[in-house]
Swiss-Prot record:
MF terms in GO: ATP binding; hydroxyethylthiazole kinase activity; magnesium ion binding
NCBIfam families for the chain: PRK09355.1, thiM
Function field: Catalyzes the phosphorylation of the hydroxyl group of 4-methyl-5-beta-hydroxyethylthiazole (THZ).
Record: residues binding substrate: M45, G194
Name under which the protein is recorded: Hydroxyethylthiazole kinase
InterPro entries: Hyethyz_kinase, Ribokinase-like
Superkingdom of origin: Bacteria
Swiss-Prot/TrEMBL cofactor(s): Mg(2+)
Pathways involved: Cofactor biosynthesis; thiamine diphosphate biosynthesis; 4-methyl-5-(2-phosphoethyl)-thiazole from 5-(2-hydroxyethyl)-4-methylthiazole: step 1/1
Length: 269
């Protein structure tokens, strides 16, 4: 997998304008929609159980995010996910805060048991808790612990039969056989709420147009990281408010040439 291949997926997303159905959380809905629009995808936020199955069936990808968890949303996620599976629509799952409470952890384990996932994305603590591996967590943003991130990612990919994505200072993408580390991004991303949730939806846009889900995820993470670096270079001294606005600009303006120039990936043995 080389940078030229990866950069082509960015162009394909913009040419295809994929419909991404998001069942996401109330904190990030606006930011997610704007980020997808800036990228060149078409977001839809449909949550009602009466319509989610139909909407999911016509989407390019379905993104399930359990950030602000309620029983009615879990029901909607299951309906949408099963419809997506029947209609060969890739499903992405963001198990926000898995491990923080018993209910949240129960849901985070139930969804992959019921729905076939194209990819799961979270920090190390979240992914570890989904597969019942011990990892310290405090709140929904915890991502540090004492385990091996690559090992956890590979185990999750194998157990859940999916592409596992663990994000942090370095990002890991694996299907259990191919494992790629992405070293793009900027620390200021952690100062803006919703950047992780938006990333999962961006991966959804890439998965909608590239059926090699490992390549799609690597392309999405590299693109997202480079866009954040370009935005930070212009705004980091001003603060996270200015960064957030410029980041949306860079999601629209970052090119395949930028990816080839600034992308940093490594395939592990």
């Amino acid at each position: 997998m080389n940078m030229k291949e990866i950069s082509k997926v960015v162009d394909l997303v913009r040419e295809s304008n994929p419909l991404v159905h998001n069942i996401t959380n109330v904190v990030v809905t606006n930011f997610t929609a704007n980020g997808l629009l800036a990228l060149g995808a078409s977001p839809v936020m449909a949550y009602a159980k009466e319509e989610v199955a139909e909407m999911a069936s016509i989407a390019g990808a379905l993104v399930l995010n359990m950030g602000t968890l309620r029983p009615e949303e879990v029901e909607a996620m299951l309906l949408a996910g099963k419809s997506a599976n029947v209609n060969n629509v890739p499903v992405l799952f963001d198990p926000v805060g898995a491990g923080a409470t018993s209910y949240r952890t129960e849901v985070a384990r139930h969804i992959p048991a019921e729905i076939e996932l194209a990819s799961i994305r979270g920090n190390a603590a979240e992914i570890a808790n989904v597969i019942n591996e011990r990892w310290e967590i405090k709140g929904v943003d915890a991502g540090t612990g004492n385990g091996n991130v690559v090992s956890i990612a590979r185990q999750a990919a194998d157990e859940l039969n999916t592409v596992a994505v663990i994000t942090g200072k370095e990002d890991v993408v694996t299907d259990g056989e191919r494992t790629i580390v992405i070293r793009n991004g900027h620390p200021i991303l952690t100062k803006v709420t919703g950047t992780g949730c938006l990333l999962t939806s961006v991966i959804g846009a890439f998965v909608a147009v590239e059926k090699d889900y490992v390549k799609a995820a690597v392309a999405a993470l590299t693109f997202y990281g480079v866009a954040s670096e370009l935005a930070a270079a212009k705004t980091v001294e001003k603060g996270p408010g200015s960064f957030q606005i410029e980041f949306l600009n860079q999601l629209a303006n970052t090119t395949s040439s930028d990816i080839e120039k600034y992308g940093k990936i490594e395939e592990l043995e």
